[in-house]
Amino acid sequence: MNYEQLLTAADQEGLLVKEQPLTGHDGLIRGSRIAIRKDIETQAEKSCVLAEEIGHYRTSSGNILDQNKVESRKQEYRARLYGYNLKIGLVGLIRAYEAGCGNLYEMAEYLDTTEEYLKEAMQCYHAKYGVYTVVDNYVIYFKPFAVIHMISSAD
């Protein structure tokens, strides 16, 4: 999802998203109000921040800014995973493969995300699924990254 699509999704969830001058964070959520740092340079980067903040809305409760607390770190992980799935998802990785993306830069461009966010998503997927996972007729390997389309033989 690109930034505009995420803004629409946030609106449909009843969330109010505003771009504001922030220091110390790229995005913050309080209740149903999301603030995105106004001076973030690219729409792709803003979309990554917004996806994570929507993830916080859907999965977190309370103030989790203190990442020294185990429960705060768990909530942060859940919110990021939700954001990765919303913004990229396993199907997004397959779509990038089908579109002929040959490297991380091309995949990030195709998925309208930053390379760093894509790397973090793949690390998170690796932690969740292990070395690989199967989606429909595809095997997605996370280390090293590869997508393989399985062809079934006709009997």
Regions found by a protein language model. Give the residues of each.
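Active-site hotspot residues in diverse enzymes, especially metal/ion-binding acidic/histidine motifs
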Residues: 1-49, 54-155
